């Protein structure tokens, strides 16, 4: 299955047969004091620095989140989107819990964006499915619903099926639904990674959709996060993840290696290009 996103002119194809597409996570105020300070001043220079560094490091799509306490994201998210799109021809992933901010950003954007995110809750489906349909956007569907997050992989897949069915019923193409099986902290739930990996395998087998996840979530609260994230990322890609949301400076080498091992990089062209560009 192929999900097509686009910037002003550039298309990015997320394909279940690979290669892996990286969604850069760094434009997010969480733990980024400088980003909060510059956004408060309506200064987008640092946003553009983060965009450029991620693209250079291997990001194909950029996640854009401007959420911090007291922010007017209905105003700031579209302004940030315009600033990025004026300088870079790259597809954007619009990241906000506020449906009005998502809609405002979609109005301001060029190309085809990815909404981050919907879930199986009725309020979420009713608020955002019409928006995705109206603006022709793809979206990420989280495997959680009104009952919360289950540890049963089969139930997570059932939630994914529900989201896809509702999207299709709303007139959205099935291929424009990317599923997030949810990666949770292994420090809090010892089987968290196994649950996520099994959910990924089931989604790939039963539904055949593209799959994303927040790659660094599993290591929260632990030392050696980079090593743990790297191990999990390789396993997740082998299980069926096609477009992780992550720091490209940390995971591009892992993703290029996994694609090569899985036979998705003929004659190691992308692998060699990446490592030669780093020297």
Where does each model-flagged region fall?
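Domain-level signal for soluble alpha/beta catalytic cores
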Residues: 1-178, 184-279
């Amino acid at each position: 299955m192929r999900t097509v996103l686009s910037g002003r002119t550039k298309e990015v194809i997320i394909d279940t047969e690979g290669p892996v597409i990286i969604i850069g996570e760094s434009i997010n105020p969480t733990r980024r004091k400088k980003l909060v300070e510059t956004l408060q001043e309506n200064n987008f220079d640092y946003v553009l620095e983060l965009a450029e560094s991620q693209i250079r490091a291997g990001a194909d799509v950029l996640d854009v989140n401007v959420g911090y306490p007291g922010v007017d994201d209905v105003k700031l998210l579209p302004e940030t989107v315009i600033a990025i799109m004026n300088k870079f021809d790259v597809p954007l992933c619009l990241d906000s819990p506020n449906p009005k901010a998502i809609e405002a950003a979609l109005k301001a954007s060029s190309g085809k964006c990815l909404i981050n995110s919907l879930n199986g809750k009725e309020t979420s489906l009713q608020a955002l499915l019409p928006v995705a349909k109206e603006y022709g956007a793809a979206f990420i569907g989280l495997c959680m619903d009104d009952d919360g997050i289950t540890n049963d992989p089969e139930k997570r897949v059932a939630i994914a099926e529900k989201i896809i069915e509702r999207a299709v019923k709303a007139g959205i193409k099935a291929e424009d639904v990317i599923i997030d099986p949810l990666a949770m902290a292994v420090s809090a739930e010892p089987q968290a990674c196994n649950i996520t990996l099994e959910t990924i395998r089931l989604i790939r087998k039963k539904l055949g959709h593209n799959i994303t996840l927040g790659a660094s979530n599993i290591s929260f609260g632990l030392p050696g996060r980079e090593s743990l994230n790297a191990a999990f990322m390789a396993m997740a890609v082998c299980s069926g993840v096609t477009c992780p949301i992550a720091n490209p400076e940390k995971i591009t080498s892992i993703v290029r290696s996994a694609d090569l091992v899985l036979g998705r990089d003929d004659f190691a062209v992308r692998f060699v290009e990446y490592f030669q560009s780093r020297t």
